Amino acid sequence: MNLEDLAKKTISEVSSIMEEQRRQNEILKEQELNRKTEIKDELPPMEFVCEELDTPQDLEDKISMAKFEEEQKIQNNIEISTQENKEFKKEEPFLQNEILNPSVMTEVQTLNEDIFLKHLRERILVLFEGLNSIKKDDLENRLNLTINFLEFLLANIEDKLKK
């Protein structure tokens, strides 16, 4: 047997194997189509209600937008309070001793901590609602998003503790 005959034999074997695989794929496709039509025939007609479902990317975008909006609100509140403090200092400079009073400072810190904890509670409740309403296939994406969110919260809490 020479090299040319061996090549022809190998090519014919490979082509027969490929032909068999193609035939098997066609049979599988036919079976799949038959199964789908059987399932459609068995099921009663359904009315489709279209609802816009959020994808994991949409959810991430909404969360990041909510975080951004909250940070903007905090910045606006800081700016407003800074402006009010400037006006307050201009109007009544003799009250500066009261501001430095430890009891007043404690009240302000307590108020700020209460606000922070309230916002933290709301964020965690939203997080739990999101985790409870998730489908099994999106679970990994949601868990990654949750881990990132919890890391963000932990960093905020650590910053508060340092102050």
From Swiss-Prot:
Signal peptide: none annotated. Keywords: Host cytoplasm, Secreted, Virulence. Changing T55A: Does not affect induction of secretion of IL-8 and ability to invade host cells. It is found in: Secreted; Host cytoplasm, Host cytosol. Transmembrane segments: none annotated. A motif (MKD) lies at residues 135-145. GO terms for cellular component: extracellular region; host cell cytosol. The keyword Secreted applies. It comes from the Bacteria. Disruption phenotype: Deletion mutant is motile and binds to host cells. It shows a reduction in host cell invasion, induces significantly less IL-8 than the wild-type and has reduced MAP kinase signaling. Mutant is also deficient in maximal phosphorylation of cortactin at the ERK-1/2 phosphorylation sites and in stimulating membrane ruffling. Mutant exhibits reduced virulence in a mouse model of campylobacteriosis. Its main location: secreted. InterPro entries: CiaD_C. Interacts with the host cell protein IQGAP1, thus displacing RACGAP1 from the IQGAP1 complex. The Mitogen-activated protein (MAP) kinase-docking motif (MKD) is necessary for cellular invasion and IL-8 secretion. Interaction with IQGAP1 is independent of the MKD motif. Effector protein required for the development of acute disease and colon inflammatory lesions. Required for maximal host cell invasion and maximal secretion of the inflammatory chemokine interleukin-8 (IL-8) from host cells. Acts by activating the host MAP kinase signaling pathways ERK-1/2 and p38 to promote both cellular invasion and the release of IL-8. CiaD mediated activation of ERK-1/2 leads to the phosphorylation of host cortactin (CTTN) on serine residues and association of cortactin with N-WASP, promoting actin cytoskeleton rearrangement, membrane ruffling and host cell invasion. This is Campylobacter invasion antigen D. The gene is ciaD.
